[in-house]
């Protein structure tokens, strides 16, 4: 199983957010027993990362990502996330 746990840091709440400082991720592949991690600050690199995760079908995992992180990424990067999501707020 593959999944990607991530978090973002921004300058404000959704309605006033104008800056994405970084996206931090840990990507796990339990079948191959591998872990990758990184901190992305460049908007193009973040867009490419998200497009890759969606294309290969890796679920994004995080806390409150349905109501904050993903909408902020869509707003600031002009992307639409259509991939799988696991929101730990919803399951807590």
Regions found by a protein language model. Give the residues of each.
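Short acidic, Gly/Ser-rich segments with clustered Asp/Glu that frequently serve as metal-coordination loops
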Residues: 8-15, 66
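Short, flexible loop/turn motifs enriched in small residues
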Residues: 15-22
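Conserved DEDDh/DEDDy metal-dependent 3′-5′ exonuclease domain
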Residues: 2-5, 22-92
């Amino acid at each position: 199983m593959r999944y990607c746990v991530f978090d973002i840091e921004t300058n404000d709440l959704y309605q006033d957010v104008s800056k994405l400082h970084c996206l931090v991720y840990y990507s796990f592949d339990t079948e191959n027993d591998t872990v990758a991690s990184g901190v992305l600050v460049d908007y193009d690199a973040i867009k490419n990362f998200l497009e890759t995760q969606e294309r290969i079908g890796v679920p994004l995992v995080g806390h409150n990502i349905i109501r904050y992180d993903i909408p902020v990424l869509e707003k600031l990067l002009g992307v639409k996330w259509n991939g799988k999501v696991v929101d730990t707020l919803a399951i807590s």
